[in-house]
Design a protein with these regions (language model features):
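Catalytic, metal-anchored helix/loop core of enzyme active sites in primary metabolism
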Residues: 1-388
Length: 388
């Protein structure tokens, strides 16, 4: 019997957040929502608040605070606004687990606050570990905070390592779907990619930013950096394999050559429920695998055609603040692509220019990372005027 977990959902109106609330809705005996956080999707946030009755609702964009406050004025729900309010909400004593499903750099500060308070983190915001992996893992150890990955690949690796304490890990095999353009062979094909085509992922239902990252293979690059810190494994021991079926979510090879893999339907509710249940499995009625209908294939990623993956390996090799630069430039690149201001293939050009211009700092703190993130974003927006 799972003890009831009290959850703060950061990014409740996004793809991961809404799927997490589906899990809660199906297992109200196991989970209780105490905090909901959204950026500006007020209509959905208000509906979620009325359904789940959290103690606190936070709208991070303060311009929408009056609307949310008015809509919930007849309830006992406390309504707060702004980034500081998010950090305040996650450390409440009635929060056991903080699901960090905010997109991008914005998830870093509340994650740090929750870790410092010793909370359990269900980590979906991979950018947090990309930008500040060494700092995050060090603080988690110091404050006794547990970090459980929500990304399907990292959840798979985590599950493969259960029961293997003390057994040397030789290699992580990080699987990738390859995205919607996996079969493309020429640069010209990628240069002609439209936003609509890039948003059509073949296997997964995700938010716009993650879907574009998946199409460009940057998502796998960010996940590689995340895996480096989560599992204390050097980049040279993390191999990316394209697995178009998205059934094998990742694998781990041990020193004796044995390999463990975690398989399942491409459904984010599975790793979400595993993390929220603190690795205790909750029953569900989701579709099951039929192995007689499956074919598993593997390919090497084409890092010449999709240079973002190579750029991620390069950023990790440079170390220090280089991954922060990679992340900031990528966020601007994706934003510009979605707005029709930058071509699909040109996103990697913008990111490469940001990395080339940066001299990594070996030691850093939150203030330095915040200042660097802002500076790289500004510089990248300026470079947009010179890239097509």
């Amino acid at each position: 019997m799972i003890q009831k977990k009290r959850i703060a959902v950061l990014g409740s109106t996004g793809s991961i957040g809404t799927q997490a609330l589906e899990v809660v809705r199906s297992h109200r005996e196991a989970f209780e929502v105490t905090v909901l956080v959204a950026r500006r999707s007020t209509e959905l946030l208000i509906a979620q608040a009325l359904e789940f009755s959290p103690a606190v609702v936070v709208i991070s964009d303060e311009a929408y605070y009056p609307e949310v406050r008015q809509a919930l004025s007849h309830t006992s729900i406390e309504v707060m606004a702004g980034s500081e309010a998010i950090a305040e909400a996650v450390v409440r004593p009635d929060v056991d687990i903080v699901l960090t499903a905010m997109v991008g750099f914005s998830g870093l500060v509340p994650t740090l606050a929750a870790i410092t308070a010793g909370k359990t983190i269900a980590l979906s915001n991979k950018e947090t570990l990309v930008v500040a992996g060494e700092l995050i893992m060090s603080l988690a150890t110091r404050h006794g905070a547990r970090i459980l990955p929500v990304d399907s690949e990292h959840s798979a690796i985590y599950q493969c390592l259960v029961g293997e304490e003390g057994n040397p890990l030789e290699r992580i095999l990080l699987t990738a779907s390859g995205g919607p353009f996996r079969s493309y062979k020429r640069v010209e094909e990628l240069e002609a990619v439209t936003v609509e085509a890039a948003l059509r992922h073949p296997n997964w239902s995700m938010g716009a930013k993650v879907t574009i990252d998946s199409a460009s293979l940057m998502n796998k690059g960010l996940e590689m950096i995340e895996a480096r810190w989560l599992f204390d494994t050097p980049a040279e021991s993390i191999e990316v394999l394209v697995h178009p079926q998205s059934i094998i979510h990742s694998m781990v090879e041990f020193a004796d050559g044995s390999i463990k893999a975690q398989l399942g339907q491409p459904d984010m509710r599975l790793p979400i429920s595993y993390a929220l249940g603190l690795t205790e499995r909750v029953s569900n009625d989701y579709p099951r695998l039929n192995f007689l209908e499956q074919t598993f294939t593997f390919e090497r990623p084409n890092m010449e055609l999709f240079p973002n993956l190579a750029l991620a390996y390069r950023a990790l090799e440079l170390g220090g603040t280089a991954p922060c630069v990679l992340n900031a430039a990528n966020e601007i690149a994706v934003e510009a692509f979605l707005a029709g201001k930058l071509g699909f293939r040109a996103m990697s050009t913008l990111i490469a220019q940001a990395l080339e211009a940066h001299r990594p700092e070996r030691s850093y703190d939150l203030q330095l990372l915040s200042e660097l993130d802002a500076a790289v974003r500004a510089e990248s927006r300026e470079r947009l005027n010179h890239i097509r």
